[in-house]
Amino acid sequence: MNEIQIRTAGIEDRAFIRSVAERTWPSTYGSIISQAQIDFMLDWMYSNDALAQQMNTGAEFYIASIKKINDQWEEVGFCSVSPEKEEGAITTTYKLNKLYVLPKAQGSGAGKALLDKAIEVAKLAGAPSMFLQVNKLNSAYTFYLKKGFIKEADFKFDIGNGFFMDDYVMRLHF
């Protein structure tokens, strides 16, 4: 088993976060959505301004590092979680906004460690659950099922420029 560290990311980590997204999205979404949509969504969600806005409006980002043979640490992925007040809800829940691990580190335990950190953050805040959106054809859907998330709904979101997100909404109750 790999030794993994999770640390809080800051504004100075935006380039790394963008880099992980740029390196994971082609293999994750390349057979699901067009390159034009990938480019649009990367600019929409991962520009310096977009990441700064997310960080400044309640989204917490975390970075996973794996210890290498030479005792050096290599950053391999990130996640983002934020409090969300759902329509009609009395309590605030949490949303897992993003969780990406570099292809070379998938299966290393980094994704599980990031998910565990996101769940810990939500539980410590007293949230009753955590939800997420995942593309219906993304293999991460199976990962989340194995971690106890249940499919709650499916939605097609118009994100502009003629593009849509065709997702499942999944939830983990604590």
What role is predicted for each listed range?
Residues T92-Y94, P128-Y141, L145-K147, D154-F174:
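C-terminal "cap" of GNAT-fold acetyltransferases
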